[in-house]
Amino acid sequence: MWIGVISLFPEMFRAITEHGVTGRAVKSGLLQIECWNPREFTHDKHRTVDDRPYGGGPGMLMMVQPLRDAIHAAKQAAGDGAKVIYLSPQGRKLTQAGVTELATNQKLILVAGRYEGIDERVIQTEVDEEWSIGDYVLSGGELPAMTLIDAVSRLVPGVLGDQASAEQDSFTDGLLDHPHYTRPELLDGLAVPEALTSGNHEVIRRWRLKQSLGRTWQRRPELINNLALTDEQESLLAEYVREVRDSVK
């Protein structure tokens, strides 16, 4: 997978190109990340990349010419088929379903804004989609871009050593992940659930599914409401709910 990034702070992306799962993917050639800095496309001695907004008001916008030139350079490097994404609070909220959708693209160009944002006409003429990672304000689009890269790259075949890791992650099936345990078997008086030490794969599978359903019901009930549960899932969830209610009587 090829990902181009437009950013005034390309050095920030070393965090994902040199470390962790994404760093290994880059080193193995499964993931290629290239950055373009609009500052490199300026024509004045001060290398200006911000400009005043029409209508006044606080803050500045990214200057149109350097930004557009950087996007054009990334598009030329990408060739045909690259989808341009602007990381924006006004965009579609990123979910695991959205990550799966984005992962079907072989080429992405991510535009990380700064200041108060970018000219609306640049969005209209250069951007294919806007995406947001949540309803809060950040100083720029770099962290959202890195979040998107990390999430999408996990779905690229071969990036994870065990593809089951991606398939069993939280949200992959619309549910939160089940609890995890490792050694020691007893920690400060708290034991690993018997189901996980039983050695019975079916018992373990059902326990994990029940915990996943129950945790989603308790912490993100809106996710449960949006799912069409199977008979087994409904039965396990009902069992979990009874256990919780019995424990507080």
UniProtKB/Swiss-Prot annotation:
Chain's role: Specifically methylates guanosine-37 in various tRNAs.
NCBIfam families per UniProt: PRK00026.1, trmD
GO cellular component term, pick one: cytosol
CDD domains per UniProt: TrmD-like (cd18080)
Example of a GO biological process term: tRNA N1-guanine methylation
Name of the protein this chain belongs to: tRNA (guanine-N(1)-)-methyltransferase
Species: Aeromonas salmonicida (strain A449)
Catalytic reaction list: guanosine(37) in tRNA + S-adenosyl-L-methionine = N(1)-methylguanosine(37) in tRNA + S-adenosyl-L-homocysteine + H(+)
Record lineage: Bacteria, Pseudomonadati, Pseudomonadota, Gammaproteobacteria, Aeromonadales
Chain residues that bind S-adenosyl-L-methionine: 113, 133-138
Localisation per UniProt entry: Cytoplasm
InterPro entries: Alpha/beta_knot_MTases, tRNA_m1G_MeTrfase_C_sf, tRNA_m1G_MeTrfase_TrmD, tRNA_m1G_MTases_N, tRNA_MeTrfase_TRMD/TRM10
The protein's assembly and partners: Homodimer.
